[in-house]
């Protein structure tokens, strides 16, 4: 019989929806411990292996769903550690992972820099771990390792600038910005061409001008520098698995999703991606060196 899986510590729930729910139920006690046997998922072993802060589970995940998420996540962490070349994925226990505990409206998954938590939603979070982990790398290595007074994120965060002259630093920050500059340039050309083709370069009709402006506004999110890096990182993880004739649908989406689906507009066609790959590989090598420093 499976033992009930619960959060790995009381501290991990800070800021989560599950914490808020329990705060509103003061007459109920909450279990914060669990007993392992040989049939159980060993949460502490996974945390120690990858230096993670902890796991958090939403109240709306039943025990079987918790097992499924943890087992899928464990496999994905193993793949991620091979791609990066380090098991220090939690960056000295800074980063934790939540399952269905911190959901945001319309978001399949998200990263919370304030609490350093990656949240994978109950229903739609499959394929999102690499993307959100890319955010965690970008933020933590920028805030604590290769620092810049203006930008916590190595990439420059929510800036939409094609280049950031003030975002200078050491190897991590400089290589990251070379990569994001080039990826941003490719993406912006493609998005602008799409808008011009759909509405015309200078539409004469008022309704077309307004429609184009609305779509330009909706594209802003896709132009954020930290989002560009996270999407490129997840696409890179998928490509590395594809090279081994493998896939991991909890870690990333399929290669066809990135290159042939409707979402492909916001990623990089294979030819463009391969032009970016040497810079991405260079950055991953520096990630490896940084994460493996004792």
Describe the function of each predicted region:
Residues 2-69, 86-294:
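Active-site-flanking segments in enzyme catalytic domains
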